[in-house]
């Protein structure tokens, strides 16, 4: 398995960040490559599942199964798409007047081959890291805008 991670401090309360993170109406604005929800059963609670599809240039159909959900602390899912599978762990913590959000992605390529490890190391890992960073960057912008306006999340 390969691992990538990124962290970002959002200038908003833990409650605001947590609530926005799990609001599906906001996902198109911040989840990298997100298209639409196909189905959701019990999500985001432990044991729940989510199936979503990306936009044209994205990952295709993505399925998630919630492994752990501790309100305002951690959310961990097992995921699978046509090219990869693994786990995404998201941790939330108060940091000063804001909220530190950390995403750790453990993944493996579903299709092997003699050059799979090299391809991952040279190309795919940086794309995965970039996707996490884009998502958190957009989450930060969206939540801070909502918090600054004094409005409730979507």
Predicted regions and their residues:
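Short, surface-exposed coil-to-beta transition loops
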Residues: 3-5, 59-64, 85-89
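Generic structural detector for well-ordered beta-strands
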Residues: 7-11, 38, 53, 65, ...
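Short, solvent-exposed helix-to-loop capping segments enriched in aromatics
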Residues: 19-32, 47-58, 127
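Short, highly charged C-terminal tails/helix-capping segments
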Residues: 34, 38-39, 137-154
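Short beta-strand segments that buttress and anchor functional surface loops
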Residues: 49-55, 75-82
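Beta-strand/loop substructures that line and gate deep hydrophobic ligand-binding cavities in soluble
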Residues: 78-134, 141, 150
């Amino acid at each position: 398995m390969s691992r990538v991670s990124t962290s970002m401090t959002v200038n908003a309360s833990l409650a605001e960040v947590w609530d926005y993170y799990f609001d599906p109406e906001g996902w198109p604005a911040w989840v990298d490559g997100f298209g639409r929800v196909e189905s959701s059963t019990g999500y985001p609670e432990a044991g729940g599942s989510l199936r979503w599809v990306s936009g044209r240039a994205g990952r295709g159909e993505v399925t998630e199964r919630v492994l752990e959900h501790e309100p305002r602390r951690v959310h961990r899912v097992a995921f699978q798409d046509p090219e990869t599978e693994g786990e995404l762990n998201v941790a939330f913590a108060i940091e000063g007047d804001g909220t530190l959000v950390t995403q750790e992605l453990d993944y493996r390529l579903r299709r092997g081959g003699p050059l799979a490890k090299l391809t991952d190391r040279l190309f795919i890992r940086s794309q995965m890291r970039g996707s996490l960073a884009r998502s958190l960057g957009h989450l930060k912008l969206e939540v801070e805008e909502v918090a600054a306006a004094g409005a409730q999340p979507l």
